[in-house]
Amino acid sequence: MQINKLYDDVYEIKDFLSKEEFDAVNYIINNTPEKDWFDEESKKKNNIPDFWYGKYLHFETENIFTTINTKMKNLFDSYSYYPDKLSLSRYKKGDFITQHTDQWIPDLPYYIGYGFCLYYNDNYEGGELEYPDLNITVKPKANTLYIHGGHILHGSLPVLDDRIRYFSTVFIHGTDESPTILNKELFK
């Protein structure tokens, strides 16, 4: 695992997953039927917004994404809440997410300390990750985790071809009593 600091509160971790973990994710990507991406029951149960319908795969049972989620959680010394499930997301041709910060809901009893985005493939055109206020635009490589502070403006550019971009995101919460603090040994 190689950690690169791109800017204050923006990190890139190459080769985040082991070969076995990476292969297990790709097995799910390559063997999930298209109909599973459009599960109405899961949409209702997990409050999946229309924007994410067909782009979001939620798992009810433990699998490789449980292992990955634990690995991500271990990058912290402190936090108030860390989600117990990790999902698989995808963007098809034309899909993107507009520039935003992860701390977008006012008056919450917590803040989003960090957002994580782990990329599983890089064989698509477009789909770059951008941090416009920092003048950073990157084409994420497969098996690379990006970490950014919840206050940092970011977004993605549209996927330009018919190859699908696969990734997982997670948001880590903090409070005044339990702030989000990255592992001091890893993030020096």
Would you name each region that the model predicts?
Residues 17, 29, 103, 120, ...:
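Short beta-strand segments enriched in hydrophobic/aromatic residues
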Residues 112, 125-188:
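Catalytic core of Fe(II)/2-oxoglutarate
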Residues 1-80, 87:
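Non-heme Fe(II)/2-oxoglutarate
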Residues 81-95:
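A short glycine-rich, His/Asp/Glu-containing loop-to-beta-strand
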Residues 90-91, 107-125, 171-172:
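Short, conserved beta-strand element in jelly-roll/cupin
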